[in-house]
Amino acid sequence: MPKMKSNRGAAKRFKRTGSGKFKHRQAFLNHILTKKTTKRKRHLRHTLVTSGSDQAALRRMLPYG
């Protein structure tokens, strides 16, 4: 049986943690930053863990992590 392909868009955006969850960077921090407050930009710098309802879809898209 051939290897499964990873979804390349998801592979660039999500990383699997040691416990099997997926972490990702927050959106809205690439451009048009002058109108956003310093507090908002500071909070957007942190990475997030995906919600439980998205875990199954991500496991299918990224079979090898």
Curated annotation (Swiss-Prot):
PROSITE patterns: RIBOSOMAL_L35. GO terms for cellular component: cytosolic large ribosomal subunit. One of its GO terms (biological process) is translation. The keyword Ribonucleoprotein applies. Residues 1-23 are annotated as: Disordered. Residues 10-23 have a biased composition (Basic residues). Keywords: Ribonucleoprotein, Ribosomal protein. This is Large ribosomal subunit protein bL35. Belongs to the bacterial ribosomal protein bL35 family. One of its GO terms (molecular function) is structural constituent of ribosome. SUPFAM superfamilies: L35p-like. The gene is rpmI. Coiled coil: none annotated.
